[in-house]
Amino acid sequence: MATKYEMSKTYQYRKVMKPLLERKRRARINKCLDELKDLMAECVAQTGDAKFEKADILEVTVQHLRKLKESKKHVPANPEQSFRAGYIRAANEVSRALASLPRVDVAFGTTLMTHLGMRLNQLEQPMEQPQAVNTPLSIVCGSSSSSSTYSSASSCSSISPVSSGYASDNESLLQISSPGQVWRPW
């Protein structure tokens, strides 16, 4: 008879605990779905008050994750490709900014975009690797009357440290005579 009593006790325990555990599980699922709905509403720029069904929340999440996965496929693998991709994005942003400004000279915009395009073409050409790392570079400092050649260890007083950051600012003042010259936009 003791076995029957314990079985009924176990049976009663299961009868009470199973629905309680199921309620807790559903509460966890609903809480996570609510959090997911809020997060996805931010990501897809919708209001958080929209009435989404659970299936809608999951579908939007799956779509968003697929878009993220696709965008990561287009990320360049090496630093040169990454630099080129960033350069192209920056040039496109400059183009959009020039188009949106009302009183920009068309000739200026054309010249700037042509310059950026030429620099991009130079970037896309295969670069030569420098042959020797330890050899000093020759720097030619130009002035209105004469040019003087200095080694990389000596200073060049005619070059101003303040510039706009474009290589064209210093082209007449500074010429680096080394094989595999590389242009940098900074």
UniProtKB/Swiss-Prot annotation:
Its main location: nucleus. The orange domain and the basic helix-loop-helix motif mediate repression of specific transcriptional activators, such as basic helix-loop-helix protein dimers. SUPFAM superfamilies: HLH, helix-loop-helix DNA-binding domain (SSF47459), Orange domain-like (SSF158457). GO terms for biological process: cell differentiation; negative regulation of transcription by RNA polymerase II; nervous system development; regulation of neurogenesis. Participates in the control of cell fate choice by uncommitted neuroectodermal cells in the embryo. Transcriptional repressor. Binds DNA on N-box motifs: 5'-CACNAG-3'. Keywords: Developmental protein, Differentiation, DNA-binding, Neurogenesis, Nucleus, Repressor, Transcription, Transcription regulation. One of its GO terms (molecular function) is DNA-binding transcription repressor activity, RNA polymerase II-specific. A motif (WRPW motif) lies at residues 183-186. It is found in: Nucleus. InterPro entries: bHLH_dom, HES_HEY, HLH_DNA-bd_sf, Orange_dom. GO terms for cellular component: nucleus. The lineage of its organism: Eukaryota, Metazoa, Ecdysozoa, Arthropoda, Hexapoda. This is Enhancer of split m7 protein. Transmembrane segments: none annotated. Transcription repression requires formation of a complex with a corepressor protein (Groucho). Forms homodimers.
